[in-house]
Amino acid sequence: MSRIGRMPIAIPAGVTVEVAENNKVTVKGPNGTLDRVLPAEMDIKVEGDTVVVTRPNELKRMKSLHGLTRTLIANMVTGVTTGYQKVLEINGVGYRAAKNGKELTLTLGYSHPVVMKDPEGVETILEGQNKITVKGIDKEKVGQYAAEIRDKRRPEPYKGKGIKYSDEVIRRKVGKTGKK
């Protein structure tokens, strides 16, 4: 059996998990509600304060879906209890971010400012002009929006200018050597 898939998911106090037909899982918690349709082949059962995912047979596809389904439910439970966040840092002369309502305006050395709208269920918080925190209860949406912000100006290897994750390490390169 899948090692991740067979681990039961603990449901903390204050969180409810409901499984409707066609494996539509709804997780309600202190931070909000998440719902998602999971693969119909998997058997999802709520047993007391745990959720158990089982698979019908040993086909490779079923083994893959087993671990995936369990992890998606675990991420939903974590999201409604503690939430997710990603921290981005902006490096570079004149590079900065500004927030106006739900709009994030990035000045990244282009001839125009880059304006991004926060998606539903995700919020951005600015700490100073060069630190952006993306927060939300849906892990996928938080990661996707953080990646979209980073893609507006990826860090370059010579000076490290651009937008990077706070825990990301940029491999630096040595520039050209001048003539002697």
Curated annotation (Swiss-Prot):
Keyword field: Ribonucleoprotein, Ribosomal protein, RNA-binding, rRNA-binding
Top-rank taxon, per record: Bacteria
Signal peptide, first to last residue: none
Transmembrane segments: none
Function: This protein binds to the 23S rRNA, and is important in its secondary structure. It is located near the subunit interface in the base of the L7/L12 stalk, and near the tRNA binding site of the peptidyltransferase center.
Protein's name according to its UniProt entry: Large ribosomal subunit protein uL6
PANTHER family for the chain: 60S/50S RIBOSOMAL PROTEIN L6/L9, LARGE RIBOSOMAL SUBUNIT PROTEIN UL6M
Biological-process GO terms, alphabetical: cytoplasmic translation
Gene3D superfamilies in UniProt: Ribosomal protein L6, alpha-beta domain (3.90.930.12)
Subunit-level organization: Part of the 50S ribosomal subunit.
Cellular component aspect of the GO annotation: cytosolic large ribosomal subunit
